[in-house]
Each structure stands twice: as C-alpha cells, then as structure tokens.
Design a protein with these regions (language model features):
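P-loop NTPase motor domains
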Residues: 2-18, 22-227, 240-243, 291-294, ...
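C-terminal regions of RecA-like/P-loop NTPase motor modules
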Residues: 184, 239-364
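H-loop/switch region of ABC-family ATPase nucleotide-binding domains
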Residues: 233
Length: 364
C-alpha cells in the first residue's frame, strides 16, 4: 500500500482544472508571495504575520524575544507599504531596507541598537537571488494558479530533514490559508494534515516553534471561522500527551475512525472520553470487504457527544481506481497517465487492459 498522499496526487491529476499539486523540494519556487496584498494596505493581522515571517528568516532567537527589535521591524514594514505602491515581495522589501539603510533610523525615530541593519541584510540574504533559500521567495506562475483552485495539495516530504525550512514554509502556508479560506466567509474551506504523526514533531531549532502547537492554534482559529481543519493519524498514541494534543481533541467536532485493532479503538475511547457504550460498540463493528462481489469500506463518524453512525462506501470500478493506493495498480495507472495525459483516460485504459487479461485467462 502506498502513502495516502499519493491518493491526493492522483485526485489532482483527475481534476487538473480545479486542483493543484505542489511537491516542494526546495529546488524550485514555492509559488507563494506572502507580501502580496492585491493593492490594499495590509491590516494589523497581516503586518503581524509578515513580522513573524521576517523574524523567521532572520533566525535569531535573541531578536525574536527583543521587543525593541520587533517594534522596529513592524515600523519598517508599515513604512515599506506606504512608500512602495506595488510589486511587494520579500526580495523587494529586502532591497528597500538595503537602499534606505540608516535613513530609516531618523525617519522612523529608531535608535541604531533597536534594529541591526547589517545583521538583517547578512542573514536574510539567504532568501535573495543566489541565496541558499532563494526559491522560497522566488516569483512563480503557481501564485496565480493557486488563486483559482478549489483543491491544493502541498507535499513537504522532500524537505522534512530541514526543520527550519519546514517551519518557514508552514508560516507561509498558514498565511495563504488565512487569505484563501478565512477571508471569504461565503466559502467554506477545509485544511487537512495528512500523515500528521510524522510532521507534528518537527521543531525549528532557531525559534523553538513546532508544527504541533501551530496546528493546535489553527484548530482553535478555524473553528471560529467558516472553515474546518482535520488531521490524519494511524493511532492517537503517535501524538504527544500534552496541552496541544488535548486542545486539538477538544476542538474536534467530527471524529472519523477507519477499521483498526482493539488497541487503536481503546486509545480513541480514552482520548475522546467516549462514555456512550453504543457509540463504542458501533465503532468496533466496522469492517472492510475489498474481495467481495460488491467491495466496500466502512467508516465510523461521531458528531461530538450527541450522535454517531457508520457509513458504508461502495464505489463503481472507475471511482475505486480513482481512489487507488495499491502499489501495483497505482504504478500502472501512473504509467498509463504519463502516456495519455489524462487520469480519466488512464482509468478507462486500465479497465480495458484488465478485461483483456481476464478474457485471455478464460480462453486458455
């Protein structure tokens, strides 16, 4: 069985006009410009986000914890938007600080020791053209594509060995979510963290920030907006027993459980404090049958404390292939897709190949 992230990749192939799959490896542009504000002056929340992002770029815990430095950076970012009418991005902001230099001290009434320009320019140069992390801020056509997609997949597996980069990318992604999901309350958006157990432990050694605390905050915030957030884990034992895990559980309104073993069921009952015995029995009753005449899968769904049900999913052969994660079948579908250029066509061709194989076996 392949990773479930491959399923999201295959779905994005099936709906290329409505979806986007970004497998970020650090060697190509990310395609997100957090400094972009569509010609509007950024509000206080946006300014705070940009300040936090620049502080991450700066990578100095001492500066992050120095109120004077943070206030100075806030003033400079605000003045940047006042002075520069368009073309906002981090490289442009960097050049603005470089160009204005020590004149900023006088213009903004900042003491030199309250903002170390030389340190900023030296450390943050890694995010400029030619720098080690230049692709984080490099312009890309993907930026426009993201504005017009309903389903976006960010694959960060290839950079998981760089906790600092992951922390930076997550900050940028959350800003994108803020703009795409939360800014328009007429549209309900959903954020899903797949294979979350692997990523929750990642911690930025410079700022001390970790993914788990950030996601816990996201749960709390999205619950108050017209949005939803979900995390996918194999077992709750994979999550640390701390305030952030408890916060995520407390803010979980819908619980989904796939068929598992008794240990996983018992962990779920304990973590979510499920007292209703009928809910527990219902959860433990679910089964999958992929070898029958009509293959199906079952899932237990619990709506907070009030209601629980089991849903059985039977799919047509075409839809079953669209959600396929089996290694052999997935690889064959991808092979046909590369030739056909369409996942829909690949599924039909795969069915035809299977039918021919079956007819050949029957005629022997």
């Amino acid at each position: 069985t392949r990773r479930s992230s491959d399923l999201f990749y295959q779905l994005s192939q099936l709906y290329p006009d409505r979806s986007l799959h970004i497998d970020y490896d650090g060697s190509s542009p990310l395609g997100i410009n957090p400094f972009y504000t569509a010609g509007k002056q950024p509000d206080n929340e946006k300014i705070k986000t940009l300040v936090n992002l620049v502080l991450k770029f700066w990578r100095s815990k001492a500066i992050m914890e120095d109120t004077k430095q943070v206030v100075s950076l806030t003033k400079i970012i605000c003045r940047y938007y006042e002075d520069i009418p368009d073309g906002h991005c981090f490289p442009d902001f960097y050049r603005y600080v470089q160009r204005e230099g020590k004149k900023l001290y006088e213009r903004l009434n900042i003491l030199p020791e309250y903002f170390d320009i030389d340190s900023f320019l030296h450390v943050c140069s890694e995010f400029m053209p030619g720098g080690f992390y230049e692709n984080v801020c490099k312009p890309s056509p993907l930026e426009n594509d993201m504005q017009n997609r309903d389903f976006i997949v960010f694959e960060l597996t290839k950079i998981k060995k760089d906790p600092f980069l992951i922390s930076v990318i997550m900050t940028i992604l959350f800003d994108t979510i803020e703009n795409k999901i939360l800014s328009d309350r007429s549209v309900r958006g959903m954020l899903i963290f797949d294979e979350y157990a692997e990523s929750q432990s990642i911690k930025d050694t410079f700022s001390g920030a970790d993914i788990h605390s950030t996601v816990a905050f996201c749960y709390q915030k999205l619950r108050k907006e017209n949005g939803a957030v979900g995390t996918i884990v194999q077992s709750l034992a994979q999550l640390p027993d701390n305030e952030y895990t408890k916060g995520i559980i407390a803010n979980t309104q819908l619980l989904y459980v796939l068929p598992a073993n008794e240990i996983v069921y018992d962990q779920t009952v304990e973590a979510f404090h499920i007292k209703n015995r009928s809910h527990v029995n219902l959860m433990k009753s679910i089964r999958n049958d992929f070898s029958g005449v009509r293959p199906y899968s079952e899932i237990f769904i619990r709506f907070m404390d009030s209601y629980a049900t089991v849903v059985r999913l039977e799919l047509s052969p075409e839809k079953l292939l669209a959600f396929q994660t089996d290694g052999e079948k997935w690889n064959k579908l991808q092979e046909i897709y590369k030739e056909a250029g369409s996942m829909e066509t690949a599924i039909e061709k795969y069915k035809q190949l299977k039918q021919k194989s079956y007819e050949t076996e029957m005629s022997m």
